[in-house]
């Protein structure tokens, strides 16, 4: 699987749901907690096309978006190919990487 980064805060239920889904898929990820970290949140927003909500999920260089976006990929059967480096459709409306 390719590298996965997820920006979170401690008490965010959507962050916990995203981590549960990724863990259920057997995906290893790096969690970046931006609780009380203005620089970390600014870095996240810069990478996430201005989005400031958490979670923000990146699979390789692909910005997936938040939990709803991750769940939509799973529902459409596109999450496993993305996690395995076979992104043909692009995530979050972006171009395929």
Q: In which residue ranges do the predicted regions lie?
A:
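Structural micro-motif
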Residues: 49-58, 68
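Non-catalytic, surface beta->alpha helical segment in thiol-disulfide oxidoreductase systems
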Residues: 59-88
